[in-house]
Amino acid sequence: MNQVTQFSGNSANLMLYWILKSYYSRFDRIMWIDTLGTFNPAALPLPCLEKTMLVRSFDAQGLKDAVDELESNLKSSEDQAYALCIDSFSNPIGLLMAQGNISFAHAFMMTLGRKCRILTRKFRLAVYLSTSLVYIKQLHLSKPALGNSWPFCLDHSYILEDQQHNKCLVHCNQSRKDLLGCSQLFLLLKGSFTHEYLTIDFYNGTPVSVSSKLHVSPSLYHSSTLNSPS
């Protein structure tokens, strides 16, 4: 389970597009859950789009139904590798919380989060989702939305920090492996991210060594994002 927290607008979604463009060849099928109605097919290459099933889910129940459908697909094709991208996990959960029953919304969120994480352990599945950044006035700092319990569902959490001159710094603020504190600099060119030197392998969930830039293991599913995912 990988979370990307945006600094503004659709910055986290640009990160999800970049991840798919970089690693789509590792997956047989991709499900993109669009909770905002902003999916941009022009951001992905045609071979990636051909593998992608787009699901529009604007509320929490629709999000759950999409994950249930993915689980059914995984059970019927256990030999295939899947990627799940959720373009704004915090949006449907926030709408559910706004209805007033905070306890129910929190339980719903944690149940769905744990289910996604369990699926990454049982099947060849990598999960990438974006969330919003909220400002905590009392602490004078910003942090990912969804509260203090949600990080227990994650393997890696990244925060995007806006830099000057069309630069964006991706900082790992939570990791079950050895990514904590690692940063990746991206350049924003023509509405999409690119990089000069890759320091984080977002597929294996590991730092990229100088001598093995995105080395692919002979066994594809040795990856920590598949079967033992990040």
From Swiss-Prot:
SUBUNIT field: Interacts with rlp1 and sws1.
Name the UniProt record assigns to this protein: DNA repair protein rdl1
Keyword Membrane tagged: no
Top-level taxonomy: Eukaryota, Fungi, Dikarya, Ascomycota, Taphrinomycotina
GO cellular component: cytoplasm; cytosol; nucleus; Shu complex
Listed GO biological process terms: reciprocal meiotic recombination; recombinational repair
Localization terms from the record: Cytoplasm; Nucleus
Native organism: Schizosaccharomyces pombe (strain 972 / ATCC 24843) (Fission yeast)
Summary of the function given for this chain in its UniProt record: Involved in homologous recombination where it functions at an early stage of recombination in a pre-recombinogenic complex with rlp1 and sws1. Also has a role at a later stage of recombination in association with the rhp55-rhp57 complex.
Top-level taxon of the source organism: Eukaryota
